[in-house]
Curated annotation (Swiss-Prot):
It comes from the Eukaryota. The chain crosses the membrane at residues 24-44. Changing H363A: Abolishes adenylyltransferase activity. Induction: Up-regulated in response to activation of unfolded protein response (UPR). The lineage of its organism: Eukaryota, Metazoa, Chordata, Craniata, Vertebrata. This is Protein adenylyltransferase FICD. Glycans are attached at N275, N446. Residues 285-420 form the Fido domain. Residues 45-458 are lumenal. The fido domain mediates the adenylyltransferase activity.
């Protein structure tokens, strides 16, 4: 609305209805601003209380020997193909289909790579394999030959990933089928060993006395860090100290976005709900539980959409989630899976990671899907006796990359990523209480001479 200079008042006669409407708009705007400020000043439960709730939930699980024993022995039970390991792989996510010229260049690069390999120039060969797949990520022959190359370097995890990707594109590719039949049991063995290592660290954390002051301090710090990183992943610009200020003083940070500050309050409310209501509750996870988590996550930012499924189609990167008419049905199937024997027989980290991925794949909400999925993942971990984990904002690129790889057909890299985050959280807790970290097994053992790899993006 344009304000009229006082000198022009005599020259311009404003209709009465315009004046009334203007006052109505100003009152509405002022009410919205005051509402946001009041939300920031609402009493927030002490962070220490929430940390104690987490600790209480973890220690309550000690009184359930059957559940604890089940979690400890899951790693020895038959596993699905969704294995977990700390190692990375060359993740090849097809952004677009290769052009005819790109396919020709990829073919030429593959031929050169094979020639360099024959001559023993393996470093050059690797670069050429990577270039071929950069030009055409769906080039099945290049995927298979690069898998063979990786297997020769004892990089079994990467080789298996490449064979799997080739079979996703061409399910009856004979060479890829034969090679993957050879690598899959090896990968599963490596992954099962990693499960055992993670479980040994969980037992160490659970053996720390409840009253340990160092553990309480690090849990409190972890609480702040979790909120900071989970909102930062979504683009929130508040610093860790600003988030601490909001939660400790219950006052707004001057000059910073009220929406971003309300996101912090929403995360705090959702975590409080999980810690005090869901963690130690016996029974199935329901759609209502997921909606209640989301209602708190988004309630201070968008109360209209909070706690309700989206009614419009959305696009998430290169992923097109289900049509809004199918969301409720898919959520019912998702919750049915959450409470199924199949899911319960998975290792807790695998179960939590798959739940995260399945929920974010459905993308049932207009906003807040990532935060809600990460909270659900931590709920599952805590119910199994694990501490809540944090995906750091510095891992954002890798996090989204493995999600894209899962959308392309192989969810295992995503599960491995979550497993590594779990290990990092456990190491943080054990390092803070040093006496309990003695004689822990190395989390990334070089089993059977297999080579360590890092995620490499073409």
């Amino acid at each position: 609305m344009m304000l009229i200079p006082m000198a022009s008042v005599m020259a311009v006669t404003e209709p009465k209805w315009v004046s009334v409407w203007s006052r109505f708009l100003w009152v509405t705007l002022l009410s919205m601003v005051l509402g946001s400020l009041l939300a920031l000043l609402l009493p927030l439960g002490a962070v220490e209380e929430q940390c104690l709730a987490v600790l209480k939930g973890l220690y309550l699980l000690r009184s359930k020997p059957d559940r604890a024993q089940h979690a400890a022995t899951k790693c020895t039970s038959p596993s699905t193909e969704l294995s977990i390991t700390s190692r990375g792989a060359t993740l090849l996510v097809a952004k677009t289909k290769a052009s005819p010229a790109g396919k020709l260049e990829a073919r030429a690069a593959l031929n050169q790579a094979l020639e360099m390999k024959r001559q023993g120039k393996r470093e050059k060969a690797q670069k050429l394999f990577m270039h071929a797949l950069k030009m055409d990520p769906d080039f099945v022959d290049a995927l298979t030959e690069f898998g063979i190359f990786s297997e020769e370097d004892k990089d079994i995890i990467q080789a298996d990933y490449l064979y799997t990707r080739a079979l996703t594109i061409s399910p009856y590719h004979e060479k890829a089928l034969v090679n993957r039949d050879r690598t899959l049991p090896l990968v599963e063995e490596i992954d099962q060993r990693y499960f055992s290592i993670i479980d040994s660290k969980v037992k160490k954390v659970m053996s720390i006395p409840k009253g340990n002051s160092a553990l309480r301090r690090v849990m409190e710090e972890t609480y702040y860090h979790h909120i900071y990183h989970t909102v930062a992943i979504e683009g929130n610009t508040l610093t860790l100290s600003e988030i601490r200020h909001i939660l400790e003083t219950r006052y707004a940070v001057p000059g910073k976005s009220l929406e971003e500050q309300n996101e912090v309050i929403g995360m705090h409310a959702a975590m409080k709900y999980i810690n005090t209501t869901l963690v130690s509750r016996i029974g199935s996870v329901t759609i209502s539980d997921v909606l209640e988590i989301h209602r708190r996550v988004l309630g201070y930012v968008d109360p209209v959409e909070a706690g309700r499924f989206r009614t419009t189609q959305v696009l998430v990167g290169h992923h097109i989630p289900p049509h809004p008419q199918d969301v409720e049905k898919q959520m019912q199937e998702f919750v049915q899976w959450l409470n199924s024997e199949e899911a319960m027989n998975l290792h807790p980290v695998e179960f939590a990671a798959l739940a995260h991925y399945k929920l974010v794949y459905i993308h049932p909400f207009i906003d807040g899907n990532g935060r809600t999925s990460r909270l659900l993942m931590n709920l599952i971990l805590m119910q199994a006796g694990y501490p809540p984990i944090t995906i750091r904002k510095e891992q954002r690129s890798d996090y989204y990359h493995v999600l894209e790889a899962a959308n392309e057909g192989d969810v295992r890299p995503f599960i491995r990523f979550i497993a590594k985050c779990t290990e990092t959280t456990l190491d943080t807790l054990l390092f803070a209480t040093t006496e309990y970290s003695v004689a822990l097994p190395e989390a990334q053992p070089n089993h059977s001479g297999f080579k360590e790899t890092l995620p490499v993006k073409p």
